A protein has these predicted regions:
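Carbohydrate-binding surfaces of carbohydrate-active enzymes
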Residues: 187-192, 196-200, 204-217, 221-225
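Hydrophobic, well-ordered secondary-structure elements that form the walls
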Residues: 120, 185, 198, 227, ...
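Hydrophobic/aromatic-lined pockets within catalytic cores
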Residues: 38, 42-45, 101, 105-109, ...
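Juxtacatalytic substrate-recognition/specificity segment
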Residues: 2-112
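Surface-exposed patches in mature extracellular/periplasmic domains of secreted proteins
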Residues: 43-53, 107-113, 131-140, 199-205, ...
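Beta/coil-rich, acidic/histidine-enriched accessory regions frequently appended to metallopeptidases
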Residues: 212-289
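Acidic/His/Gly-enriched intrinsically disordered linker/tail segments
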Residues: 90, 111-182, 195-196, 207, ...
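Soluble non-cytosolic domains of exported or imported proteins
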Residues: 20-32, 86-91, 95, 110, ...
Length: 289
């Protein structure tokens, strides 16, 4: 089955090993994911892309035990899904949003995993909120919980992020790597919105990159230089330089405070008044300020 939006094509390939009911659930799920992805640029990041869904053993709690993005002439997102998973269960799972978010940048597929996984980890929560699966409160709670998991991953505390990221597949440190990257993108998003009084955002900055270079295959240093150049800011490269040598996840509390978010007993609380409320809501809804 194919989905078409704004002249762009998404091929959906579902294994015939799924029942007809499961196939309907899977197409409904992909339709929700692809709709959420459109909230970033107003269109999909690729003109022609595909998703391939195969059955996974139904012997665990995770409805999507494995997924990956394969870059190529046609970018492909591959999911292995439990045959018993329903559409609502799939929509509540973070995995689909995470994998689709990888397509937001023209990444060459190697180096600086913290950057690409951080992008996907940040946007997986934002996209869930924008699709209506979770509310704004839950989105910030999920981000807080993620940063806490990253802070608890102390095995490589004191080692530079770039080094931990390079060795992650062999040695571990996934939470430190992923959530340091998610901090990078939250920090960039908030600074862009604050400093431009809402004229800029991470969505808009990445859209400029997509417009320029969607068909390119760029390294992360290339990407951050392009983001600064295209958006006429001094932010992405300097923040990259800061993060890659960081020896722990930077403090998220000042960012949360600037958005009117406090934490008590592990639960986020959202202030309803103050200068950060509109910015906070804009991130969750995708609405330009």
């Amino acid at each position: 089955q194919n989905l078409v939006s704004d002249g762009r094509l998404l091929e959906i390939h579902v294994s015939d090993q799924f029942s007809e009911t499961s196939r309907q659930h899977l197409v409904e799920w992909i339709t929700t994911l692809s709709g959420a992805l459109r909230t970033i640029y107003g269109h999909w990041p690729r003109r022609h892309w595909q998703t391939v869904i195969s059955p996974a053993p139904a012997n665990g709690d995770d409805p999507i035990p494995w997924a990956e993005v394969q870059r190529g002439e046609i970018d492909s997102v591959k999911f292995y899904v439990s045959p018993t998973a329903g559409s609502e269960e799939l929509k509540r799972a973070w995995t689909g949003y995470h994998e689709f978010a990888h397509l937001l940048i023209p990444y060459q597929g190697r180096g600086d995993s913290w950057f690409t996984e951080g992008l996907a980890s940040y946007y997986q929560n934002v996209l869930q909120a924008r699709s209506g699966v979770i509310d704004e409160q839950a989105m910030w709670q999920k981000l807080y919980d993620g940063y806490q998991r990253g802070l608890a991953d102390t095995r490589f505390h004191g080692r530079p992020l770039g080094e931990v990221s390079r060795g992650m597949r062999q040695e571990g440190g996934f939470m430190r790597v992923y959530w340091s990257g998610a901090w990078y993108f939250l920090a960039a998003d908030v600074r862009l919105r604050q400093q431009s009084r809402g004229r800029l955002s991470l969505d808009k900055a990445l859209e400029q990159l997509n417009r320029c270079c969607a068909d390119d295959s760029l390294s992360v240093p290339d990407i951050v230089r392009k983001l600064d150049e295209l958006n006429r800011v001094i932010l992405f490269k300097s923040l990259y330089d800061e993060l890659v040598v960081s020896t722990e996840i930077p403090a998220y509390e000042p960012i949360f405070a600037s958005l009117g978010i406090s934490v008590k007993g592990g639960k986020v609380q959202l202030q309803q008044q103050g200068p950060g409320v509109l910015i906070r809501g804009g991130i969750a809804s995708g609405d330009a300020l």
